A protein has these predicted regions:
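Conserved ABC ATPase "signature" region
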Residues: 75-76, 128-147, 256-257
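Conserved ABC transporter NBD signature motif
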Residues: 64-76
Length: 333
């Protein structure tokens, strides 16, 4: 079995609007290995969630997906029909959404929804499916699992609903899980529990995990590798250690300056921020998308598109015309 669970090349998502074409995701390349956690991080509106929906082929009707390569465990799923993708979703790859209350059907019990998933993808009797659903609820830390199977989503707390979503996603033991901001709607204590649970289950089932988030604290806890998105593009990617200890792209560095560091950030000191606004992605765009907000911008930055470059290693790459040496001098200054 291949260690490479997900392999994506040149993913773009365009959305036709009355004012033009919105280039929401542009030229995204990703890969995830078995047992690895890839965190996709960036500001709201940068294209993180659209990227995850594009991988699952769940984009809105008007959105146009183009992609050169989409492989799951070495097998191409590019060009699959909706019927074929429905066999993949929930079976070989699963998704955990940000707000479980909008993902679970309020008209059906937890048990009915979990059993339906199993009967769709596995040749099981109703009794066997119910037993497996109960077992999975217990595995994700839900007590009184038999009782929970008979309850409706509104009868559970936010944390319990998210655990139910995780249990449903794991029912068929998928090779890949995509989690889109799975802890945003939860308080800090429950958030930590859910992250720990995801990591433990990932290790147990030997899955690949793509975690979409804007919370760098979450990234620091769970990531193996990190992809930083800005205005629809990946502007930097590398191991979690590289991104946190030696960020290269000016946008990534700006994000890191926004994080208060215990023991280093003085009480009352202003928090870091990135000045300016994200550019409009409607119509054609030439040059670096971060140019208007970057301290190192030159005319060259606006004249031509910038590709990811990896001058220092095969594991870290950044989208900037400036050399590592120049970026280092600017950081010191």
């Amino acid at each position: 079995m291949s260690d490479r669970v997900l392999d994506v090349e040149n993913l773009t998502v365009d959305i036709p609007l009355a004012t033009g074409i919105l280039h929401a995701v542009d030229g995204v390349n990703l890969h995830v290995d078995r047992g690895e956690t890839l965190c996709i991080v960036g500001e709201s509106g940068c294209g993180k969630s659209l990227t995850s929906l594009a991988l699952m082929d769940l984009l809105p009707t008007k959105a146009i997906r183009k992609i050169e390569k989409l492989e799951l465990s070495g097998a191409s799923i590019l060009g699959y029909s909706e019927r074929e993708m429905s066999d993949v979703r929930g079976n070989k790859m699963g998704m955990i959404f940000q707000e479980p209350m909008t993902s679970l059907n309020p008209a059906f019990t937890i048990g009915n929804q979990m059993i339906e998933t199993l009967l769709r993808h596995r040749n099981l009797s109703n009794d066997a499916a119910r037993d497996l659903a109960k077992l999975m609820l217990e595995k994700v830390g839900i007590t009184a699992a038999e009782q929970r199977l008979g309850q409706y989503p509104h009868q559970l707390s936010g944390g319990l609903r998210q655990r139910v979503m995780i249990a449903m996603t794991l029912l068929c033991e998928p090779e890949l899980i995509i989690a889109d901001e799975p802890t945003t709607a939860l308080d800090v204590t429950i958030q930590a529990q859910i992250l720990l649970l995801l990591k433990e289950l990932q290790n147990e089932f030997d899955m690949g995990l793509v975690l979409i988030t804007h919370d760098l604290g979450v990234v620091a806890r769970i990531a193996t590798r990190v992809a930083v998105m800005y205005a629809g593009q990946i502007v930097e990617q590398g191991t979690a250690k590289q991104i946190f200890e030696n960020p290269l792209h000016p946008y990534t560095r700006g994000l890191m300056r926004c994080i208060p560091v215990p023991g280093k950030t003085k009480r009352g000191a202003p928090l870091g921020s990135i000045p300016g606004m994200v550019p409009s992605l409607i119509g054609d765009f030439t040059g670096c998308r971060f140019a208007d907000r970057c301290e190192l911008t030159s005319d060259v930055c606006r004249q031509s598109d910038v590709s990811l470059r990896d001058p220092n290693s095969k594991t870290q790459a950044y989208r900037c015309i400036h050399s590592i040496e120049m970026l280092a001098k600017a950081e010191v200054a």
